Amino acid sequence: MPKELAKQYAPQGTEDRIYQNWCDKGYFHTLIDRSKKPFTIVMPPPNVTGQLHMGHAMDETWQDILTRYKRMQGYAALWVPGTDHASIATEAKVVAKMREEGLTKEMVGRDGFLERAWDWKNTYGNRIVSQLKKLGCSCDWQRERFTMDEGCSDAVKEVFVRLYNEGLIYRGNRMVNWCPHCNTSISDAEVEYEAKEGSFWHLLYPVKETGEMLELATTRPETMLGDTAVAINAEDPRYKHLHGCHVVLPLLGREIPIVCDEHADMEKGTGVVKITPAHDPNDFEVGKRHDLPMIRVLTYDGHMTGAADKAAVDAEKAAGRAAADEPDVLDCGKYAGMTALEARKAILADLEACGALKETEPLTHEVGTCYRCHSVIEPMVSKQWFVKMEPLAKPAIESVEKGEIKFVPERFTKNYINWMKGGRDWCISRQLWWGHQIPAWYCDDCGETVVAKQAPCTCPKCGSSNMTQDPDTLDTWFSSALWPFSTLGWPNENAEDYNYFYPTNTLVTGYDIIGFWVSRMIFSGLAYTGKAPFDTVLIHGIVRDSQGRKMSKSLGNGIDPLEVIEQYGADALRMMLIIGSTAGNDMRYSDEKVLACRNFANKLWNASRFVQMNLPEDFEPGLPEESLLDMSDKWILSELAKVAAEATANLDKYELGLAAEKVENFIWEVYCDWYIEICKTRLNGEDAAAADAARKVLVYVLDKALKLLHPFMPFITEEIYQALPGSAETIMNEKWPGDENMKVWAEDCADFEKLMDYIKAVRAMRAEMNVHPAKKTSMVIETASPAAFEKGGAYLARFAFATDVTVTAKYEGSTDGMVNVATPDAKGFIPMMELIDRDKELARLNKELTKAEKELGMFTNQLNNPKFVEKAPAKLVEETRAKLAAAQDKAAKIKESIAALG
């Protein structure tokens, strides 16, 4: 026996109970079923450091909608959940916690630190998982993964070794983005550019051979200590005489060459640029072209280098342990140990004192910052591991261009291709302890490098057993790039999950990580599995606050989804995040929107209670014979068929917001506001067969409507569904209504809609005239569609407050004291004089007429003004013409009503 619905719906408690039941029954676990087509989504793994924010809530809601929809369509729908180890963020959390205990990484050692990191992950890392469950995510938790679990680690090692053996991973001294705060390199994609106030300092370098001064400008004067050349353009006529000459570096007195290079732009400034190969990416390339030495003047924690730094590197070089391309290190003397900013001030003061600072020019420029800590990035030459991007990028670009993978919206295809074409080799090593340690070992005796999945026992070159593993870890995105297939059992290509569920289908993610993650998954999937990892990338925007601002800690405008869920329920939050949203576009959060969605939930609950309360104990669900269906039944069933087809089409095109909106409108405006009200007449009438037919249609439509709504609002739909007679174990495994061949009665629908339009017009007129519903009167309806209005007599009596209705093709009787109500299909004559205060109504109408004529005059004057018609935008002119026509129509109707009142 279905349980009775409570008087009010209370999501608190109810949602937790329902979710636990889903988990206990294993409804989210997807079996491999060869008779079904698989549909697979892998969750973009949230960081173990994180907690649910509005961006997560939207991202996961979209994925859950698609998963539930496909599950109901009969697919073997798998949504793989998991979390990311988040190297930099997690390490920072653990280091901060240790700092509170007076400890550092170095004090506890690598093993001790990793033990603490795993403890931290196990204590706090699953917090976000429990929060995802609060949202209603129907993930297969039995397949939950972590980017550092055994399977993912095996995949990471496999890929690293393969790429190394193919020559696509290499180690070398290259220019990298260095974060002095996080004390690690980061990739180009992880650098965020911020507009900052700064200066152009114009410096004077004396030419050794001629004694003249060369003027150049820099935003980073502290790096001049590492200059190894200045560059001019070979075609610049101003400096033809200086080809092959040298300048003397101010403060240091070091002679450096003047080189001719296209990097020097004749049109910019003086056309002279300082070249610091160890601290600028462009200068690094100039240095390679001219075989310039590299001199490092900054330590990895952002201080100027000193004697000890120089001695350490010199010793490595003397012992033959340093690579040939290892930069030299300068003892910066009096500036040693200063931070870069401290050194900048001191160097500028000294340059000014010796006459080498010509002028200071203020400017606003884009400065690279770390995406994690927002510290200013220092470009550094450092020995790191890199992935060669060009051979991997080419097939990844072709796959998208050929349509094997499509972006929704399509405009993001360009973002992806531009990023893939413009990227440098990917720096994948990080100077961190938490993460996948690079599977490379170095022989302490001969320096041989061994890359392997397992630690080598001896050096293959000299036989030594003194092998040391590279201390660095891999970029977090290296393991995340393998996520679509490492989560399904790869590199074991015989794994059942891999063979059945891979390639995956739809990736749902934000536009901000197309470069970070989407691109890398695409080239990884193609390179290692030979298949595109997914066929569709569905891009969503970000959730902004009600003023359109990005949510941030600094603004204090962040909204905690869990607090919203606690107050309004997960269904209301989910519906708010989907209604009105469109792929690729940002949306605004507001409490008012969530409240409106909660009100919709209450409306649905109350309507369902009404239906349940009108069912006898022996009620048998199912549609009645067609002969027992009246016009309103055929109309609601036809509307159901239409909304099911439309919602299906919208979901198939990833128009999730439109689908949700149509289902909500059907339930609220069509089913609740109209059909239920219409059924009350039959339910309370004496015709038992008509009442039973109404009950059957009410239940049938409610059942289908709940199924259409389920992907969007899973909790309340499950709770109501379980209270319906004949319900199955769970709504989530029921058949999706849009796949059924539901009948549409076009003629009956058209007739009923004519009737509805007329009823709406009568009710609007009565409301304007302040006529109480209890005051009823007769009416004459003039129409070319008499059948519709003759069949609808009962509806007119109840909803248009008619005592009796006369339907005619042409009304020729007296119109004295009658009010005219017109729709496109009918003209009604209603004797309202007996129901109203004539003088009061005339006063109201005359006031309305004055207002309408004022509007009429305003629009007429605008359109009679040649300047307006000629110079105003065409759209505005058309809108004004439309407003004029509406004002004319309104005034004419008011005059008719005044005339009718005599």
Task: Describe every region a protein language model picked out.
Residues 1-54, 77, 371, 604:
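Non-catalytic terminal extensions that flank enzyme cores
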Residues 3, 8, 17, 21-25, ...:
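Residue patterns forming the tRNA-binding/recognition surfaces of aminoacyl-tRNA synthetases
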Residues 31-94, 147, 156, 216-219, ...:
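N-terminal catalytic cores of NTP/NDP-binding nucleotidyl/phosphoryl-transfer enzymes
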Residues 34-36, 44-45, 78-91, 144-152, ...:
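Short, solvent-exposed turn/loop segments enriched in Gly/Ser/Thr/Pro and often Arg
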Residues 57-65, 214-250, 273-280, 290-298, ...:
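Extended active-site and interfacial segments that coordinate phosphate-rich ligands
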Residues 68-76, 97-110, 130, 134-139, ...:
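Secondary-structure transition/capping motifs at alpha-helix termini
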Residues 202, 418-478, 482, 527-570, ...:
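Feature 926 captures the class I aminoacyl-tRNA synthetase adenylation module centered on the KMSKS loop
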Residues 252-259, 469-502, 669, 673-676:
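Active-site-adjacent "gating/activation" loops or surface patches in catalytic cores
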